[in-house]
């Protein structure tokens, strides 16, 4: 079989104007970036506001493993399959960050015959959204440091500045730095650092805003520092929100591309799935449910992180109601959760599969708590045996959940027809969607509800500083915000080594942070890396461009 790059480079793309026309976007609502990429003007929302809503489908997964689950590939393949069975479908994905592209991943546009194209463009700069996020974020940092230098009228405590700078590359040496060295002319010296751009609160705010004015209001609420008296200092106090919003005036418009089979795809925004909510923009999702019969989107990591945040944060701010969930798993990944080492995953092991199946069952139970019907997509690998497949099917049947073998990586949309048909049936059951908690509950109650109900924790322990800050946030009027828990993605617990379905464990909340602009309180249950480093052999070393313009090494 061809490599992903070879498949993508041989794709027969249609002009993006034709893709847009097929889903009812008018020529004057498109802003073209060449022949195969476009932004969509938000003016379209006024024209289509009275159109009926299509079905909203969330693709999520079991707890991630090194064996791979194939969530993005499934999302794309499912969109293609829905179109094959006569349903008008659109897929929505997050846009890739350059850091992982040149670091370990080498690209993030699906795989096999379920990819979005033009692959090279999407992975490299795309339409400049992440650069706009970077610039808006760093403008705020520059205005704050200038305020310190010019007399510090707001009495900012330079030891309590929480706004760092960002860049869209993996750079470990920038995690902790000292600014302002070289004398008074160079500003006020202080410790700071850089995060990767997609970890920026600007990105999270972009993806939760409903329009540009909403985004500007969110920017004004961003807390950058605290005064000597302990008062929050915001971007609004620094008069930064207007300039930041101006920099984002194009970035807030969704990007339209296509899959290998010419299914329309929105790729817009890409916040972290741990310290933020890990889903593409609300703007793109709301547009998709108006233009399509089926809007298929995904959320980062496993259902304990991505799906929980999609339901409790994204659906709340976007006024969205999910109609069904596709839970992606593979027999290899389930065996990993049953304790099998990576080099043994190709061997039949029903005992380990049974243990690992508990992880899938827990995620299914969690989805049911939100009242949304689910279908399991079992990504096929050549090493899967008929006994193992039968076991997964029987266990899903016992939970009254449909399961389908997904072959979209090898066959494209054709390999997802059974999944698409079962999904359509699931959406017809009717969603009884509900939130897990109410916003008027205390912040600690919200955190503990997620830890107990979704993760399966027995108790939650707070560091003294975390307790103090939660109380401070509630006293400052932020108690009604949803919570966003940052923890390892590899386990249902906060300990990456606890695979399968651990129970009765204690979750340790070490720190809490306020993302007032994005609109949530982050509870950190573990060390979260917000600026990755490059590995021993970065993907960048194998990426090149030939004299004829052919790009090699992006995979």
From Swiss-Prot:
What reaction gets catalysed by this protein?
(6S)-5,6,7,8-tetrahydrofolate + formate + ATP = (6R)-10-formyltetrahydrofolate + ADP + phosphate
UniProt lists the family membership as follows:
Belongs to the formate--tetrahydrofolate ligase family.
Which biological process annotations from GO are given for this protein?
Answer: tetrahydrofolate interconversion
> What is this enzyme's EC?
6.3.4.3
Q: Does the keyword Nucleotide-binding apply?
A: yes
Q: Which NCBIfam families match?
A: PRK13505.1 (NF010030)
Tell me the protein's name: Formate--tetrahydrofolate ligase
């Amino acid at each position: 079989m061809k490599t992903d790059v070879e498949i993508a480079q041989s794709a027969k793309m249609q002009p993006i104007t034709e893709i847009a026309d097929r889903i009812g976007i008018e020529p004057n609502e498109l802003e073209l970036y060449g022949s195969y990429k476009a932004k969509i003007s938000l003016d379209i929302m006024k024209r289509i506001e009275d159109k009926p809503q299509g079905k909203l489908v969330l693709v999520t997964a079991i707890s991630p493993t090194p064996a791979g689950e194939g969530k993005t590939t499934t999302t794309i393949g499912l969109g293609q399959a829905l179109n094959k069975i006569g349903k008008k479908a659109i897929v929505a994905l997050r846009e890739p960050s350059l850091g992982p592209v040149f670091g370990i991943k080498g690209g993030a546009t699906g795989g096999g015959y379920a990819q979005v194209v033009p692959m090279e463009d999407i992975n490299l700069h795309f339409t400049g959204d992440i650069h706009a996020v970077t610039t808006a974020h760093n403008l705020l940092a520059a205005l704050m440091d200038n305020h310190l230098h010019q007399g510090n009228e707001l009495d900012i405590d330079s030891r309590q500045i929480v706004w760092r700078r960002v860049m869209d590359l993996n750079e470990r040496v920038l995690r902790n730095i000292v600014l302002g060295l070289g004398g008074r002319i160079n500003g006020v010296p202080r410790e700071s650092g850089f995060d990767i751009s997609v970890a920026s609160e600007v990105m999270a705010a972009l993806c939760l805003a409903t329009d540009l004015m909403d985004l500007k209001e969110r920017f004004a609420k961003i807390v950058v520092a605290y005064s000597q008296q302990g008062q929050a200092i915001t971007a609004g106090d620094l008069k930064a929100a207007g300039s930041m919003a101006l920099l984002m005036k194009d970035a807030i418009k969704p990007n339209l591309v296509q899959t290998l089979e010419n299914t329309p795809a929105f790729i817009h925004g890409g916040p972290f799935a741990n310290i933020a909510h890990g889903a593409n923009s609300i703007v793109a999702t709301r547009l998709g449910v108006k233009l399509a019969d089926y809007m298929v989107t995904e959320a980062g990591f496993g259902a304990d992180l991505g799906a929980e945040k999609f339901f409790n944060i994204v659906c709340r701010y976007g006024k969205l109601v999910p109609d069904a969930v596709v839970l992606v798993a593979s027999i290899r990944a389930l065996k990993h959760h049953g304790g099998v080492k990576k080099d043994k995953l190709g061997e039949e092991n029903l005992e380990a599969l049974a243990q690992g199946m508990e992880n899938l069952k827990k995620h299914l139970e969690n989805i049911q708590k939100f009242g949304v019907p689910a279908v399991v997509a079992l990504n096929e690998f050549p090493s899967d045996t008929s006994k193992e497949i039968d076991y997964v099917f029987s266990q899903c049947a016992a939970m009254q959940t449909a399961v389908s073998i997904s072959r979209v990586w090898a066959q494209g949309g054709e390999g997802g027809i059974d999944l698409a048909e079962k999904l359509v049936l699931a959406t017809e059951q009717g969603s009884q969607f509900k939130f897990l908690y109410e916003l008027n509950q205390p912040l600690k109650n919200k955190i503990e509800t997620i830890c107990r109900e979704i993760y399966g924790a027995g108790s939650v322990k707070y560091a003294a500083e975390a307790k103090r800050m939660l109380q401070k946030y509630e006293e400052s009027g932020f108690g009604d915000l949803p919570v966003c828990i940052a923890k390892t993605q590899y386990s249902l617990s906060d300990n990456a080594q606890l695979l399968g379905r651990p129970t009765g464990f204690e979750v340790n909340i070490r720190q809490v942070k306020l993302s007032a602009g994005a609109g949530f309180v982050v509870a950190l249950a573990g060390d979260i890396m917000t600026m990755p480093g490059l590995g021993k052999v970065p993907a960048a070393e194998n990426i090149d461009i030939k004299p004829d313009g052919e790009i090699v090494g992006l995979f």
